[in-house]
Amino acid sequence: MRKITATLKGDGPILRAVMHYLVTNAGMEVVGESSDSLDLLCSIDRLRPEVVFLWASDGLKEPGIVSHLLQEFPHLKVVVVSPNHFTISDVGARSRQSLDLSMESIRASVVESLAQ
């Protein structure tokens, strides 16, 4: 079975390591990690992942980052991970869905989104 490819964006290496663990244990392949938006854009352009996992506190420094990503890369699915529901719209998300962070729910949500 082909693995879904993902790129991660988070401020620090510890946060990215946790995200990497969750994403890979959900059965996806992490093809890139970024700590800043320029690196993220270059990484997406070069690697063409299917999904980006974006830590929302990063987006607060860059309002509208999700809208920009979706405009530049229409094929891309963006999963915004946030400890605070109110930050989701600040980064330009079109919809919001609360999920538990189990491996099964992450994978099921991404697979469902890719099927649309």
Q: Where do the protein language model's features map onto the residues?
A:
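Internal alpha/beta domain cores that form substrate/cofactor-binding pockets in large enzymes
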Residues: R2-L47, V51-Q116
